From Swiss-Prot:
UniProt organism field: Homo sapiens (Human)
Identification of the protein by name: Epididymis-specific alpha-mannosidase
Glycosylation site list: N226, N249, N294, N336, N516, N608, N670, N675, N748, N808, N812, N890
Pfam families named among the record's database cross-references: Alpha-mann_mid, Glyco_hydro_38C, Glyco_hydro_38N
Positions contributing to Zn(2+) binding: H36, D38, D151, H420
Length: 1009
C-alpha cells in the first residue's frame, strides 16, 4: 500500500523513462569540494566564524593556490563577506581574485544565505540574492550562474522562475519527498527542465538537477573503517578550534596500505549514483556541514586518491576530476541530451520517512516569522520613502551616507533571516535571539531614518512638544503609503484620552472612532479612516477634546459602545442557531450564534449567498518520548490522532461604532479559568460615502491570540463551512503563485503529510463561492475535512531525542503569538479581482510615525503638494530603491576599473534608482486583469523627476538584460502552458509592456536638478 502513495507521481516518469547512458567509455565523476555553512542554526554567526567559518576561506584559498587541479565552490555570502572585510589579508584577497579569474574558485547561488523555499516570501528571496550578487559584482565583477540549493526542506515552484530571472543557467536541489526521490532515481528522472510558472512557461525555465539519496554529503560510512569516510579534517569543534589540531571523527589518512580500499569505496559509490542518472557524467559532492576548515589535510588525502583512480581508470571504469559546479553543468550541457519537462508543480511537503513529515516548521517560532515579515515590510516602505526624499531633489539636511547605513543594516538583517534554519524556526534559542536582535536593531534604525525624513519634510511647520509636566497638547501622526496605488484603510493608534479630535492637513475633521484599548486597560484605541495616494503621506493632528462629545460644537471621534455576552460552555446543542446576532457593513453580514458565542454564518451581498462559517481553536496532542513512538519537533509534525477542542467556554463582546465594529471572542480552557488562552478579534469597516473602500469593505480582518500553550501541543484555528470543497485547498508558493492541494490518503501520517505552507494566501471554493485567507506571516495549512481549512498558529514542544537535546532544538516556546488573517468571501470573479491587492494591502500596511505636539496646531503640507506614484491595479511596485552600489552599469567599464585596481566609486551612487515591477495575475485568471499592461515610466515616475535613461536589468541588477544569454537545454514535446514565445522587447525606452506573472527590473536615471 505504501507505493500507492506515490504511484500517480511515478507513472509519468515511467512513461517518459529515457534511454540509457548516452556514450560508451568510463564514467566521469566530477568531485565538487564544498562546505555547507549554515548562517545560524545551532551556533550564532560569530561563534561559527570563530570555530570554523573563517578558517574555511583562509585554508581553502591557501590550498587552491598550491594545486592547479584543485577546485572549490563557495555558496552563501554572509560568512565570506565577514571574512573578506575582517580577516583576509591583501595577499589572500589577491589570491581570491586570481582563483576566480582562473575558474578554480566559483561562487554558486551568491546570495547572502541559502534561503528556505517553503516559508519565505518572494520579495525577501530576491532581496537576499540581490544583496549577495551586488557585493560579488561590485567586488569581483562576477555574476553567479548556477544554484546550489541543497538543504532547504522541500522545493518551491517559484524557484525556477527566481533563478532564471537572476540569470542562472542551471539549478541544483536536493531535499524532496523520500518516496518521490526513490521513484525518480529508479526512473532516472532526477534531471529535467523545470517550468515553474504556468504563465511564463519556457520563457523562464531552468535545467534542474535533484541530488540523489546521498544528497550533498559524501558517504558517511566506508566498509573498511569505523570512522566517517572522506572527512579527513574531522568535525568542527566549538567554541574554538582545538590547539593540537586534532578533531573528532577524522577519517583515516590515505596510505599505500589502504588506498585501494578508499578507491574501491569511492568508485562503488560513483557507479551506484551513475545508475540513477541518464549520462555518464556523475556529480560527486565532496564535503558536508562545516567541512574544509582545514583544507590542507583534505586535499593532501584526496589528491593521491584521485590520482590513483585515474591511473586505473580503464580497469575501474571510472575517471575522476576536481570540479566546480559550473564544470559539471558545462560538461552535461555539451552532451546535448533531450530532457523531459516538469511543469509548475512544487516539491512540497517534504518527508524523509513515513512518520517524518517536515511540515511543523511551517509554523515553528511564529513570533520570529512575524517579526521577519514586519521588518521586510518596513524596509520596503523605507526604500521608497528615501528614494522619494532624494528625488527630484533632497528637501532637507539628511545625511545620505547615514541614511544608506540604516537601509543597509536592515537589508542585511532581513536577508540573513531568510536562511533555511532561520525563518523556518529550526534554530536554537540563542540563534533565534541573534536573528531577532539584528532585525530589531535594523528596524529601529529604519524608524529613525523615516522620522528624520518626515521631520525634514515638515520643519518648521510642526512644533514638537518640549519636556513639560503638563504633558503634550496632543499628538501628530504622519502616515505613509508604500504601495503604488491609492489605499483607503483604517490606522489604529493608542492614545491616553477618551475624547479626541482628528484633523487633516487642511484642518478638516477626519472620520475616526475611539474605543477602549484591547491591550492597555488605561488607554484607548483611536481608529482613523485614511485615504492615501501611492507613495505619499497624510498628516494628522490628534488633540483631546474639551469635554465629552455631547454638548460641544467640536467634531470629535465617535465613541464605540460595547455589548457583552456571558460565557458559554462548549457543547453540542439542538438550540444552536436560534438566536443570531448580526454584524454588518456594506459587503457582509456576519451572523453570530448567541447560544454558543461562535460565528454562525456570513452573508455576502454581491452574490446574495449565505455561507455557514464556524471558527474554533483545536490542539494536536503530540508525543515527546522517543520510546513511545514518533515525535514532533522544530521540523517535524507528527500527530498521534486528530485535533481536539482546546477550550471549554467562550465569551463574546461586540464593540460597535460608526466606523468599525469589532467582534471579540475569548476562549477559556475551562468554565472557571481567569485567563483566556485563545482569542479572535474580528473587524468589519463601515466605509463612509465618498470613499473608495472596495478592498476595505470586502474583508473581515481577524487578529488572533494563542498561548501560552501547554507542553507538546500544536494549536490550530479551524474554519468549517458548508462549501463543497471536495477537501481541496489552494495555497501559495512564496506569495507568487498558487498550488492546488488535494487531500491525499496515506497509509501512515496522513494528517501531517497533508499540511502545506501558506506564505501569503490560501483559499477553498465550491462552484459558487470562494473563501480566501490572507496572512502576514507563514503558517502551516491543511484541509482535514470537506469544507474545512485549518491554520496552525503556534507550537510548543519538548522531546528526549538525543540529537534534538544536544543541539537544543526542542521548541519549548512559551510565548503568546498574535497572528493576523484577513478573510475574503465571495464569487470567484470578485475574489480573483481582490485577492492579490488585498494580500499586498495586508503585507504593506501604511507606516505610522507618531509624536507629541506642543502649542497650536501646525500648518501641515497638503496632499496637493505631493505627486503620487500610481500603477494600474494588476501591476505591483515590487521595489523602488537607491541601492547605493558603487559599480558602473557598463560591464566592460566596470571590468576595466577592477583590472586597474579601482574597486568602484569612492562614494555610493545615489543617482541610480532600482525599479522592479511585477504583474500580479496568471494568464486567463481574469478577463481584464490578466491582460498585458503597458505603462510609460516617464509618466509613472514624473513625481521623482524627468527620466533620462531606462536600463533593463536581470532580477538582481547585475546583468544588462540585452547581454544576458542563458543556456538553452533541449527538450522533447513538453507540456507547454501559457505563451510559447518570448514577448518582443523594444530596445530601451520608457514605454514598457509587462505580461502576466512577469517580473521586470530596471535602473532608472533621472535628470539632475
Amino acid at each position: 500500500m505504501g507505493q500507492l502513495c506515490w504511484l500517480p507521481l511515478l507513472a509519468p516518469l515511467l512513461l517518459l523513462r529515457p534511454p540509457g547512458v548516452q556514450s560508451a567509455g568510463p564514467i566521469r565523476a566530477f568531485v565538487v569540494p564544498h562546505s555547507h555553512m549554515d548562517v545560524g542554526w545551532v551556533y550564532t554567526v560569530q561563534e561559527s566564524m570563530r570555530a570554523y567559518a573563517a578558517n574555511v576561506y583562509t585554508s581553502v584559498v591557501e590550498e587552491l593556490a598550491r594545486g592547479q587541479q584543485r577546485r572549490f565552490i563557495a555558496v552563501e555570502q554572509e560568512f565570506f563577506r565577514l571574512w573578506w572585510d575582517g580577516v583576509a589579508s591583501d595577499q589572500q584577497k589577491y589570491q581570491v581574485r586570481q582563483l576566480l579569474e582562473e575558474g578554480r574558485l566559483e561562487f554558486v547561488i551568491g546570495g547572502q544565505v541559502m534561503h528556505d523555499e517553503a516559508v519565505t516570501h518572494l520579495d525577501d528571496q530576491i532581496l537576499q540574492l540581490t544583496e549577495g550578487h551586488g557585493f560579488l559584482y561590485e567586488t569581483f565583477g562576477i555574476r553567479p550562474q548556477f544554484s546550489w540549493h541543497v538543504d532547504p526542506f522541500g522545493a518551491s515552484a517559484t524557484t525556477p522562475t527566481l533563478f532564471a530571472l537572476a540569470g542562472f543557467n542551471a539549478h541544483l536541489g536536493s531535499r524532496i519527498d523520500y518516496d518521490l526521490k526513490a521513484a525518480m532515481q529508479e526512473a532516472r528522472g532526477l534531471q529535467f527542465v523545470w517550468r515553474g510558472s504556468p504563465s511564463l512557461s519556457e520563457r523562464q525555465e531552468i535545467f534542474t538537477h535533484i541530488m540523489d539519496q546521498y544528497s550533498y554529503c559524501t558517504p558517511s560510512h566506508i566498509p573498511f573503517s569505523n570512522r566517517s569516510g572522506f572527512y579527513w579534517n574531522g568535525v568542527a569543534v566549538f567554541p574554538k578550534p582545538p590547539q593540537d589540531g586534532v578533531y573528532p571523527n577524522m577519517s583515516e589518512p590515505v596510505t599505500p596500505a589502504n588506498i585501494n580500499l578508499y578507491a574501491e569505496a569511492l568508485v562503488a559509490n560513483v557507479k551506484q549514483r551513475a545508475a540513477w542518472f541518464r549520462t555518464p557524467h556523475v556529480l560527486w559532492p565532496w564535503g558536508c556541514d562545516k567541512q574544509f576548515f582545514n583544507a590542507s589535510v583534505q586535499f593532501a588525502n584526496m589528491d593521491p586518491l584521485l590520482d590513483h583512480i585515474n591511473s586505473h581508470a580503464a580497469e575501474l571504469g571510472v575517471s575522476v576530476q576536481y570540479a566546480t559546479l559550473g564544470d559539471y553543468f558545462r560538461a552535461l550541457h555539451a552532451l546535448n541530451v533531450t530532457w523531459r519537462v516538469r511543469d509548475h508543480h512544487d516539491f512540497l511537503p517534504y518527508s524523509t520517512e513515513p512518520f517524518q513529515a517536515w511540515t511543523g516548521f511551517y509554523t515553528s517560532r511564529s513570533s520570529l516569522k512575524g517579526l521577519a515579515r514586519r521588518a521586510s515590510a518596513l524596509l520596503y516602505a523605507g526604500e521608497s520613502m528615501f528614494t522619494r526624499y532624494l528625488w527630484p531633489a533632497p528637501r532637507g539636511h539628511l545625511d545620505p551616507t547615514w541614511a544608506l547605513q540604516q537601509l543597509q543594516q536592515l537589508r542585511w538583517a532581513v536577508s540573513e533571516v531568510q536562511h533555511h534554519d532561520a525563518i523556518t524556526g529550526t534554530e536554537s534559542p540563542k540563534v533565534r535571539d541573534m536573528y531577532a536582535t539584528h532585525l530589531a536593531s535594523g528596524m529601529l534604525g529604519m524608524r529613525k531614518l523615516m522620522a528624520s525624513i518626515v521631520l525634514d519634510e515638515l520643519q518648521p511647520q510642526a512644533p514638537m512638544a518640549a519636556s513639560s509636566d503638563a504633558g503634550p497638547a496632543g499628538h501628530f501622526a504622519s502616515v505613509y503609503n508604500p504601495l503604488a496605488w491609492t489605499v483607503t484603510t483604517i490606522v489604529t493608534l493608542t492614545v491616553g484620552f477618551p475624547g479626541v479630535r482628528v484633523t487633516d492637513e487642511a484642518g478638516h475633521p477626519v472620520p475616526s472612532q475611539i474605543q477602549n484599548s484591547t491591550e492597555t486597560p488605561s488607554a484607548y484605541d483611536l481608529l482613523i479612516l485614511t485615504t492615501i495616494p501611492g507613495l505619499s503621506y497624510r498628516h494628522y493632528n490628534i488633540r483631546p477634546t474639551a469635554g465629552a462629545q455631547e454638548g460641544t460644537q467640536e467634531p470629535a471621534a465617535t465613541v464605540a459602545s460595547t455589548l457583552q455576552f456571558g460565557r458559554r460552555l462548549r457543547r453540542r446543542t439542538s438550540h444552536a442557531g436560534r438566536y443570531l446576532v448580526p454584524v454588518a457593513n456594506d459587503c457582509y453580514i456576519v451572523l453570530l450564534d448567541q447560544d454558543t458565542n461562535l460565528m454562525h454564518s456570513i452573508w455576502e451581498r454581491q452574490s446574495n449567498r449565505t455561507v455557514r462559517v464556524t471558527q474554533e481553536f483545536l490542539e494536536y496532542h503530540v508525543n515527546g518520548d522517543v520510546k513511545q513512538g514518533p515525535i514532533s519537533d522544530n521540523y517535524l509534525f507528527t500527530p498521534g490522532k486528530a485535533a481536539v477542542p482546546a477550550w471549554e467556554a467562550v465569551e463574546m463582546e461586540i464593540v460597535a461604532g460608526q466606523l468599525v465594529t469589532e467582534i471579540r471572542q475569548y476562549f477559556y480552557r475551562n468554565m472557571t479559568a481567569q485567563n483566556y488562552t485563545y482569542a479572535i478579534r474580528s473587524r468589519l469597516t463601515h466605509v463612509p460615502q465618498g470613499h473608495d473602500g472596495e478592498l476595505l469593505c470586502h474583508r473581515i480582518e481577524q487578529e488572533y491570540q494563542a498561548g501560552p500553550l501547554e507542553l507538546n501541543r500544536e494549536a490550530v484555528l479551524r474554519t468549517s463551512t458548508n462549501l463543497n470543497s471536495q477537501q481541496v485547498i489552494y495555497s501559495d508558493n512564496n506569495g507568487y503563485q498558487m498550488q492546488r492541494r488535494p487531500y491525499v490518503s496515506y497509509v501512515n501520517n496522513s494528517i501531517a503529510r497533508n499540511y502545506y505552507p501558506m506564505v501569503q494566501s490560501a483559499f477553498m471554493e465550491d462552484g459558487k463561492s470562494r473563501l480566501v485567507l490572507l496572512s502576514e506571516r507563514a503558517h502551516g495549512i491543511s484541509s482535514q475535512g470537506n469544507g474545512q481549512v485549518e491554520v496552525m498558529l503556534h507550537r510548543r514542544l519538548w522531546n528526549n531525542f538525543d540529537w534534538d537535546l544536544g543541539y537544543n532544538l526542542t521548541l519549548n516556546d512559551t510565548s503568546v503569538v498574535h497572528p493576523v488573517l484577513w478573510l475574503l468571501l465571495g464569487s470567484w470573479s470578485l475574489t480573483t479581482a481582490l485577492r492579490q491587492r488585498s494580500a499586498l494591502a495586508l503585507q504593506h500596511r501604511p507606516v505610522v510615525l507618531f509624536g507629541d505636539l506642543a502649542g497650536t496646531a501646525p500648518k501641515l503640507p497638503g496632499p496637493q503638494q505631493q505627486e503620487a506614484v500610481t500603477l494600474p491595479p494588476n501591476l505591483h511596485l515590487q521595489i523602488l530603491s537607491i541601492p547605493g552600489w558603487r559599480y558602473s552599469s557598463n560591464h566592460t567599464e566596470h571590468s576595466q576599473n577592477l583590472r586597474k585596481g579601482h574597486r568602484g566609486e569612492a562614494q555610493a551612487d545615489l543617482r541610480r534608482v532600482l525599479l522592479r515591477l511585477y504583474h500580479l495575475y496568471e494568464v486567463g485568471e481574469d478577463p481584464v486583469l490578466s491582460q498585458p499592461v503597458t505603462v510609460n515610466l516617464e509618466a509613472v515616475l514624473q513625481a521623482l523627476g524627468s527620466v533620462v535613461a531606462v536600463e533593463e536589468r536581470s532580477l538582481t541588477g547585475t546583468w544588462d538584460l540585452s547581454m544576458l544569454h542563458r543556456w538553452s537545454w533541449r527538450t522533447g514535446p513538453g507540456r507547454h502552458r501559457g505563451d510559447t514565445t518570448s514577448p518582443s522587447r523594444p530596445p530601451g525606452g520608457p514605454i514598457i509592456t509587462v505580461h502576466p506573472k512577469e517580473i521586470r527590473t530596471f535602473f532608472i536615471h533621472f535628470q539632475q536638478q
